[in-house]
């Protein structure tokens, strides 16, 4: 989780569809059935859930990482390139635990990227500094993978129907 970019998934999907007609798998704040339905409504063929699966029973992520995901919210995310030279979203509590101020991280030297060790700090990215996507608010417990998938499907079906009803209702107001 926590792979980041400066372009909204809305803009990215629209721009990509202008030149690419193949299968598009959209990610970014997708954590439940409602967001999967939204991604498909926007024109994606598939949706990718990242962070939410880190905090599952089967995940091999550190238990401290899982606990921090469950206890955190989007307000706890810091966007920085300090740890690897590449911008990413990280959990502020993990940055603080490593002895740093998440609001005072310097910019990394982009000529000295180090993807293996976290490069620009003694704390190691993905080992000590935890990544997290912005859809973290739905990560409020650590279920099994099968439970999360079942819940996502339960949410997806009515969300897809609701979108259809709402789009028909609003199209009457938009279209002549």
Roles of regions detected by a PLM:
Residues 1-6, 55:
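Short, small-residue-enriched loops and turns at beta-alpha junctions
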Residues 9-25, 31-176:
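Conserved active-site-proximal phosphate/metal-binding subdomains
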Residues 4, 27-28:
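Residues that cap or flank secondary-structure elements
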């Amino acid at each position: 989780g926590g792979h980041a970019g400066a372009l909204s998934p809305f803009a990215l999907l629209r721009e990509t569809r202008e030149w690419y007609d193949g299968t598009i798998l959209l990610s970014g704040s997708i954590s439940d059935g409602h967001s999967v339905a939204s991604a498909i409504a926007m024109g994606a063929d598939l949706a990718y859930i990242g962070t939410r699966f880190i905090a599952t029973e089967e995940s091999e992520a550190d238990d401290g990482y899982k606990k921090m995901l469950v206890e955190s919210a989007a307000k706890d995310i810091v966007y920085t390139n300090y740890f690897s030279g590449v911008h990413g979203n990280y959990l502020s509590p993990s940055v603080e635990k490593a002895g740093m101020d998440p609001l005072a991280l310097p910019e990394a030297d982009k000529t000295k990227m180090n993807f293996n060790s976290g490069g620009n700090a003694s704390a190691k990215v993905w080992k000590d500094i935890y990544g997290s996507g912005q859809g973290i608010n739905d990560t409020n417990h650590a279920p099994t993978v099968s439970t999360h998938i079942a819940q996502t499907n339960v949410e997806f079906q009515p969300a897809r129907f609701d979108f259809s009803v709402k789009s028909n209702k609003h199209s009457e107001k938009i279209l002549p």
